[in-house]
């Protein structure tokens, strides 16, 4: 092991991301729907942010949380997909050790932040349906700002130790990672030392952060559904159930692939085919950013009408 391949005595200069193992011959074709999904995510989330930002009537808490969700979706997909496409189309898998850690930090912290936003959105719907008279008092702009700050602080605080846990490990020249982007356990498994601390801390973060978030979200929607079924108007019930159904669907799409990835990395590493694991890991950074503007935005009457109005004004000006 030569000094030219190592820095800080034990840290590699670069890693090499291989893409989806076992499907190398299909990389070019797999990248096409990935690219299409990324473009849809960019356009959809950017349009949602633009519509909410331009219309003062949409500066209510629910829409501000939607705007935050779209911002995190843009950040999550843009952190991973461009490099993913470069690997699948151009075989440009090399990434510096520092760049890999930076991508890992961004992916996990943004994901944790998005989990916090989904929890905040569940709380928003709970207050709106179960305590509507106090809605504007409980969720004013100052409270929303504090919720956003706490979510950001929590995500950075729980993910930052990953960097130090990975930098302490020796890698013994192991540089090839069978993945399309850098994540904590993918890097840790390249080490030639005991990674029990990494496994335990990663599992603790997953359970205490996103696991706790998902439980609180489930409790919130339990109260919401109980309140909805006691509404006197069938139209009000249908509207509330339609909104909640969209929210629950995107929450399931967000959490299920993530928990599958976390758990297989730690307990089913040899039982689950590698290409299945990596393919699902790609989907959980692609599917939510694509679906969020559709399920949360396009199905919301106020946003849909303002978007159509904005498009009409654009055509008129042309």
From Swiss-Prot:
Glycosylation sites: 5
Keywords: Cell membrane, Disulfide bond, G-protein coupled receptor, Glycoprotein, Membrane, Olfaction, Receptor, Sensory transduction, Transducer, Transmembrane, Transmembrane helix
PROSITE patterns attached to this UniProt entry: G_PROTEIN_RECEP_F1_1, G_PROTEIN_RECEP_F1_2
Name the record gives this protein: Olfactory receptor 52D1
Family: Belongs to the G-protein coupled receptor 1 family.
Principal cellular location given in the protein's record: membrane
The organism's place on the tree of life at top rank: Eukaryota
Disulfide-bonded cysteines: 100-192
A GO biological process held by the record: sensory perception of smell
Extracellular-side segments: 1-28, 79-102, 164-199, 262-277
Single annotated GO MF: olfactory receptor activity
Record-linked InterPro entries: GPCR_Rhodpsn, GPCR_Rhodpsn_7TM, Olfact_rcpt, OR51/52/56-like
Compartment(s) of residence: Cell membrane
Function field: Odorant receptor.
SUPFAM superfamilies assigned: Family A G protein-coupled receptor-like
Cytoplasmic side: 50-57, 124-142, 221-240, 299-318
Transmembrane segments: 29-49, 58-78, 103-123, 143-163, 200-220, 241-261, 278-298
Topology within the bilayer: Multi-pass membrane protein
GO-annotated cellular components: membrane; plasma membrane
